[in-house]
Design a protein with these regions (language model features):
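Periplasmic-binding protein-like
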Residues: 37, 87-94, 151-154, 188, ...
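An alpha-beta-alpha
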Residues: 138-180
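N-terminal helix-turn-helix DNA-binding module of bacterial transcription factors
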Residues: 1-32
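Hydrophobic alpha-helical segments within soluble ligand-binding/sensing domains
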Residues: 127-153, 195-204, 223, 262-266
Length: 266
């Protein structure tokens, strides 16, 4: 059954409502339970280039939305980020920060959590993701497909003060390869977490004239760049060489061929 209201009927309703001084009730919404600041160490452009941190932030924001928690978001590159975070109930620092920055941020608010890095200060809560199981499953999957030489292309994160954060996936990669007797010597290259870096690293490996039978990339964006470099040089995927990504981003389903990828524990 379809119910419809004619224009004439609507006008009558509005007229009566006006006579009765009817005021439409506003939807009652409860005030936010608290206000959380999210400080990102990377720029919006970097977030687009590497979805790893985007997925983390999205998870935080989804949780806050469901639990009526207000969010204020700022970047470490913003000149006024300290002022922005001065009146929040707590802070989540997303990414990598120097010891001086950690000390400064803790002085702003002692209710603070650092996500994706380990902080030595026992008074500060930090959460570092464990990639070991995901990487182990990926390499064993390639092994079961018959691959005995596998390359690794990943990224290195570096702060302004020169502090370097190596890719945590690499140690697990070499450990599992050693366990399975998979060769990787000469097939490890690290640069940045971006599509252009993936293209650059894969091109460098191709130029050496000797390729492994499979490539494990530390992110989907790196893998997509690597796929383009391979295809431009006449290699067919997966007939000539297999490529596996990491992060399970939506973009991985739109490559040609679709990218095999690992779901990151984000």
């Amino acid at each position: 059954t379809t119910l419809s209201t004619s224009l004439e009927t609507k006008q009558k309703i509005f007229a009566v409502a006006k006579e009765l001084n009817y005021v439409k009730k506003k939807r009652v919404t409860s005030a936010p339970s608290c206000r959380i600041g999210i400080l990102q160490w990377f720029s919006s452009k970097q977030e687009i280039e590497d979805n790893y941190y985007f997925l983390m932030r999205q998870g935080i924001e989804d949780y806050c939305s469901k639990n009526n928690i207000s969010i204020v978001r700022t970047f470490k590159t913003d000149n006024d980020y300290q002022n922005v975070l001065s009146d929040v109930d707590g802070i989540i620092c997303l990414g990598k920060f120097s010891k001086q920055e950690i000390k400064l941020l803790h002085s702003l608010n002692n209710k603070i959590v650092f996500l994706d890095m380990t902080v030595e200060n026992i008074e500060i809560t930090s959460v570092s993701l464990d990639f070991r199981q995901a990487v182990s499953d990926a390499i064993k999957y390639l092994y079961d497909l018959g691959h005995r030489t596998v390359g690794f292309i990943g990224g290195i994160e570096q702060l302004e003060d020169g502090t370097i954060f190596p890719d945590k996936r690499l140690n697990t990669f070499t450990d599992i390869c050693d366990e399975l007797n998979i060769k990787y010597d000469g097939f490890i290259i690290q640069d940045k977490f971006s599509t252009s870096s993936g293209y650059k690293m894969m091109s460098e490996m191709i130029s050496k004239g000797n390729l492994p039978t499979a490539i494990f990339a530390a992110s989907d964006h790196i893998a997509i760049g690597a796929m383009r470099a391979l295809q431009e040089n006449g290699y067919k995927i997966p007939e000539d060489i297999s490529v596996m990504g990491f992060d399970n981003t939506e973009l991985s389903g739109y490559t040609n061929p679709p990218l095999t990828t690992v779901n990151a524990p984000v």
